[in-house]
A protein has these predicted regions:
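Short coil/turn motifs that cap or connect alpha-helices
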Residues: 46, 140-141
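Helix-turn-helix DNA-binding elements, focusing on the entry/boundary residues of the two helices
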Residues: 131
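Glycine/proline-centered hinge or cleavage motifs at structural transition points of membrane proteins
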Residues: 138-139, 152
Length: 188
C-alpha cells in the first residue's frame, strides 16, 4: 500500500511542486535576506535596530495568518491591491496573481528571509574590520574587497541560512494549502 501511494502520479507531481516552490523560495529569501543584512550592518541607515526587530515579526506569527493577509491583499479578483489598480488606473485584469508558483514563493520569501538575515547579520558584525582596512591600504577597491574578503567570509552563513530555508520550505504546508489548492498546486 505504501509503495502504491509513492508511485502514484499525484504524489510525484506534489514532490515536483514542493521542489519548485522550495527552490524559488530559497533563492528569493537568500537574496532578500543577504541584501537587508548588508544594508543594516554596512550602511548608516537610520532605525537599524527597528528594522532588525521588524524582520523578526514573522517568527512570532503562524505562517497561515500572514498567508491569509496576503491573500486578502493580492487575490486576483477580490484583493484590495488588485482592486485599487483596476479602479484607479483602469487595468483590464489583475496586476498580481498570488495563486501561482511565483505568488506562493513570494509569500514564503516574506516569511522566511529572516533566517538568512539573522545569520548574515551575525557574520557581517563579527567580521574583523582590520581585514577591510588592510585591503584598502593595499590599494584594493570596494568591488575587490567584497569579492575577495567579504563574500568568502560570509558565504558559510549565507549557505547555512539557505539550507534552513530549503528544508523549512519543503516542510511548509500551510502557505501552499491556502494559496495553491485553487490552482491545483499541491505539495508534500
Amino acid at each position: 500500500a505504501f509503495y502504491a501511494v509513492l508511485t502514484e502520479p499525484e504524489t510525484f507531481q506534489a514532490l515536483i511542486n514542493s521542489l519548485i516552490i522550495a527552490s524559488m523560495t530559497t533563492i528569493g529569501s537568500t537574496i532578500v535576506g543577504t541584501f537587508f543584512a548588508w544594508l543594516v550592518t554596512r550602511t548608516d541607515l537610520p532605525y537599524k535596530n527597528f528594522m532588525k526587530s521588524l524582520f523578526l515579526v514573522p517568527f512570532m506569527l503562524p505562517s497561515f495568518i500572514g498567508t491569509l493577509a496576503w491573500k486578502m491583499l493580492l487575490s486576483p479578483n477580490s484583493g484590495y491591491i488588485n482592486k485599487f489598480f483596476i479602479e484607479t488606473f483602469g487595468f483590464s485584469g489583475p496586476v498580481f496573481d498570488i495563486y501561482t508558483y511565483h505568488g506562493i514563493s513570494a509569500v514564503e520569501v516574506m516569511y522566511l528571509f529572516p533566517f538568512v538575515f539573522i545569520q548574515v547579520c551575525g557574520a557581517l558584525e563579527r567580521m574583523d574590520p582590520t581585514l577591510k582596512e588592510s585591503a584598502c591600504i593595499s590599494g584594493a577597491g570596494l568591488f575587490t574587497i567584497t569579492r575577495k574578503i567579504t563574500i568568502p567570509l560570509v558565504m558559510p552563513s549565507i549557505m547555512s541560512g539557505a539550507l534552513l530555508i530549503m528544508l523549512y520550505s519543503m516542510a511548509h504546508f500551510g502557505t501552499v494549502a491556502v494559496l495553491g489548492i485553487e490552482q491545483g498546486i499541491y505539495n508534500i
